[in-house]
């Protein structure tokens, strides 16, 4: 009789526990499930609910212990294996999470969430072909699942199969017309395919559906650096960009660019942003002027960081580095590099130095394909700086990325004589080929050249430069009268750099 009483009481508690979990009362669910597992340590369901409650309450490590206990008590519970996979995924233990999701699918082949999460895991592990298979299996099970088509599209894009990726996003949108993420992913893919007009249509739809989505506003500002929309596209980002460009053209002058000119241009631009109440920021610190060549710098740096080798491309890459001394000089240099006429329209940028291992603060860079070209451009830049900025700046020619000489000191040697010039190690070729097989995306992008003229993206970046200038204590920064710090992260990093690289 006593046993039946206890059993009846436990069933009542379990029903209450399930209700607490289903209604989102996780603190109470945690408390009750702890009580049950203490009194009934082999109650598998109580351990499973305890794990879910602990996870929701931010106790991820304790949650892991509880779900492992649940799996141990009932190894054939597919849901317990799935929950264990989710927790391991959150803990970034991806290999173990993969095993759990595969076990879930083995126990329950139509467990759609497990196929989806397995796809995510495989994508992160860069096993893209396997990720594709997982998403395709999910679509077999749920052909009308818009998220599955979107996720497959992301994987196909990373595989460099842009047309198939586009088809997946369009299918997702047909199933869920107001699917913001799919519209945005489609826009990004269309930009990479060079179809800017169509990309603009999708960004317009994203902003219509979610007007204040930060990343989409940033994406659109980036698109407008190389695309002029027709009159049918009218939203605050487009309007602000147009007004900034018009003001720049009005203020454009020949000869020395005065401090007052820079201050006026910046203040006019920020006033336009305020006029349209545009809440937009960027974390970028680099303002580019791009031609149609894909330098693939992100790829090269990943190869260097992962394998400690210098990619072959970088042995023929040189740059002219210009070093302004104040924030005002940096903005002036941006204008000079915007207006400069070069035979190859070389890629160039202005930036603030954020890399902890690299010295310096303000920089302008012009990328060149050989040493002779670099020296010619360096001489030309010296003349332009004198004529348009009126101050002397340090101008040097360097080879490749600044990180390379730290690992390979001989790489920084620059001379026309082949005797001392470090050469590419042919043993590295196979490593690069293997990497590119696994990472086919970046080299297939179509790069659209940047339009001339100051734009919204430039102003957002200049705001970040000002935060940086405050961090390093640049005395000229107060002239720009930016009271708000838009990027606390950039400001803090700049303060840290000041102590390390303060000019001697």
Where are the model-predicted features located?
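Charge-rich, low-complexity segments
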Residues: 192-194, 211-334, 349-351, 414-504
């Amino acid at each position: 009789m006593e046993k039946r009483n206890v059993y009846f009481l436990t069933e009542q508690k379990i029903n209450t526990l399930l209700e607490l979990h289903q209604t989102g009362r996780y603190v109470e669910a945690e408390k009750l499930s702890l009580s049950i597992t203490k009194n009934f340590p082999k109650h598998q369901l109580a351990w499973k609910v305890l794990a879910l409650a602990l996870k929701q309450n931010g106790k991820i490590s304790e949650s892991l212990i509880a779900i492992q206990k649940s799996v141990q008590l009932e190894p054939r519970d597919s849901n317990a294996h799935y929950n264990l996979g989710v927790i391991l995924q959150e803990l970034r233990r991806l290999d173990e999470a993969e095993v759990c999701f595969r076990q879930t699918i083995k126990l329950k082949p139509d467990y759609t969430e497990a196929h989806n999460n397995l796809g995510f895991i495989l994508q992160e592990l860069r096993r893209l072909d396997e990720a594709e298979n997982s998403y395709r299996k999910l679509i077999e099970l749920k052909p009308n699942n818009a998220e599955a088509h979107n996720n497959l599209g992301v994987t196909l894009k990373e595989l460099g199969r842009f047309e198939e990726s586009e088809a997946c996003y369009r299918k997702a949108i047909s199933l869920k017309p107001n699917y913001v993420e799919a519209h945005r992913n489609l826009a990004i893919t269309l930009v990479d395919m060079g179809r800017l007009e169509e990309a603009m249509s999708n960004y317009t739809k994203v902003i219509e559906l979610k007007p204040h989505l930060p990343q989409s506003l940033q994406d659109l500002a980036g698109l407008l650096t190389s695309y002029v929309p027709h009159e049918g596209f009218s939203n605050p980002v487009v309007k602000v960009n147009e007004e900034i460009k018009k003001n720049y053209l009005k203020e454009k002058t020949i000869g020395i660019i005065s401090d007052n000119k820079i201050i006026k241009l910046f203040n006019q631009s920020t006033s336009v942003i305020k006029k349209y109440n545009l809440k937009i920021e960027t974390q970028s610190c680099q303002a580019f002027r791009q031609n149609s060549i894909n330098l693939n710098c992100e790829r090269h740096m990943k190869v260097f960081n992962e394998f400690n080798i210098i990619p072959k491309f970088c042995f023929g890459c040189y740059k002219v580095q210009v070093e302004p001394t104040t924030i005002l000089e940096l903005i002036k240099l941006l204008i000079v590099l915007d207006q400069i006429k070069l035979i190859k329209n070389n890629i160039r940028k202005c930036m603030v130095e954020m890399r902890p291992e690299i010295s310096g603060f303000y920089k302008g860079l012009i990328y060149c394909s050989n040493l002779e070209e670099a020296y010619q451009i360096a001489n030309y830049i010296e003349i332009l700086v004198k004529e348009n900025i009126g101050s002397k700046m340090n101008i040097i020619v360097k080879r490749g990325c600044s990180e390379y000489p730290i690992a390979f000191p001989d790489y920084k040697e620059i001379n026309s004589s082949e005797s001392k010039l470090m050469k590419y190690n042919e043993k590295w070729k196979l490593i690069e080929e293997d990497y590119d097989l696994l990472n086919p995306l970046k080299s297939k992008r179509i790069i659209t050249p940047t339009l001339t003229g100051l734009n919204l993206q430039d102003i957002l970046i200049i705001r970040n430069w000002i935060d940086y200038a405050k961090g390093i204590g640049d005395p000229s920064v107060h002239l720009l009268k930016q009271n708000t710090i838009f990027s606390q992260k950039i400001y803090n990093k700049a303060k840290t750099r000041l102590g390390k690289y303060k000019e001697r």
